[in-house]
Swiss-Prot record:
GO terms for biological process: nitrogen utilization; uracil catabolic process. Hydrolyzes ureidoacrylate to form aminoacrylate and carbamate. The carbamate hydrolyzes spontaneously, thereby releasing one of the nitrogen atoms of the pyrimidine ring as ammonia and one of its carbon atoms as CO2. Disulfide bonds: none annotated. It is an enzyme of class 3 (hydrolase). Pfam families: Isochorismatase. It catalyses: (Z)-3-ureidoacrylate + H2O + H(+) = (Z)-3-aminoacrylate + NH4(+) + CO2; (Z)-3-ureidoacrylate + H2O = (Z)-3-aminoacrylate + carbamate + H(+); (Z)-2-methylureidoacrylate + H2O + H(+) = (Z)-2-methylaminoacrylate + NH4(+) + CO2. It comes from Escherichia coli (strain 55989 / EAEC). Signal peptide: none annotated. The keyword Transit peptide does not apply. This is Ureidoacrylate amidohydrolase RutB. The active site is at 24 (proton acceptor), 133, 166 (nucleophile). Keywords: Hydrolase. InterPro entries: Isochorismatase-like_dom, Isochorismatase-like_hydrls, Isochorismatase-like_sf, RutB.
Length: 230
């Protein structure tokens, strides 16, 4: 067992029965020329987030945590995105951007596209699990819940983009399914102004989970920390 210093209080978990979840670290969300950038969102400060996720993934893997990578998007025809009868059709900024700029049709969040791919710096390894997801929440229409329950995993540590959209949505759904969710705040990035990041983290630490950071997480997983706890 390890104890992680977090807000609003420390949380204790078994790394080997926990998962680190990397949410949507795709070119779409973290690279200039990707969907968020083309839709008018600022992605200029995502590079430190990528580096921090690399650090967190390395520490988590060494401690025996399961690593789960999400990729948000749909088939090339966007059938999975839903038609006019779906609220996703009306609220997805990727779909709205393509309707406004038809030349982008088939390029944003389409499986197999550059936009859909994970950023070059983040590469899943054997033993990791990579899951596509068609909506903001990683629990919707994916096998995430069964994957976690079959392994006895109850604690989820979240990283990725966007804090206020897919990260928060997945953590909230996990909360309703009795999972303990922790966000590493410096391994996440918001879609929108800085207040969106602050609001998401406030919601999480106040109502749905815990908030920590990468350095604290790595220190908690270090062999020295395990020795102190033992």
């Amino acid at each position: 067992m390890t104890t992680l210093t977090a807000r609003p209080e420390a949380i204790t978990f078994d790394p080997q029965q926990s998962a680190l979840i990397v949410v949507d670290m795709q070119n779409a969300y973290a690279t200039p020329g990707g969907y968020l950038d083309l839709a008018g969102f600022d992605v200029s400060t995502t590079r430190p987030v990528i580096a921090n996720i690399q650090t967190a993934v390395t520490a988590a893997r060494a401690a025996g945590m399961l690593i789960i990578w999400f990729q948000n998007g749909w088939d090339e025809q966007y059938v999975e995105a839903g038609g006019p009868g779906s609220p996703n059709f009306h609220k997805s900024n990727a779909l709205k951007t393509m309707r406004k700029q038809p030349q982008l049709q088939g390029k944003l969040l389409a499986k197999g596209s550059w936009d859909y791919q994970l950023v070059d710096e983040l590469v899943p390894q054997p033993g990791d699990i990579v899951l596509p997801k068609p909506r903001y929440s990683g629990f919707f229409n994916t096998p995430l819940d069964s994957i976690l329950r079959s392994r006895g995993i109850r604690h989820l540590v979240f990283t990725g983009i966007a804090t206020n959209v897919c990260v928060e949505s997945t953590l909230r759904d996990g909360f309703f399914l009795e999972y303990f969710g922790v966000v590493l705040e410096d391994a996440t990035h918001q879609a929108g102004p800085e207040f969106a990041q602050k609001a998401a983290l406030f919601n999480i630490e106040t109502f749905f989970g815990w908030v920590s950071d990468v350095e604290t997480f790595c220190d908690a997983l270090s062999p020295t920390s395990f020795a102190r706890i033992a």
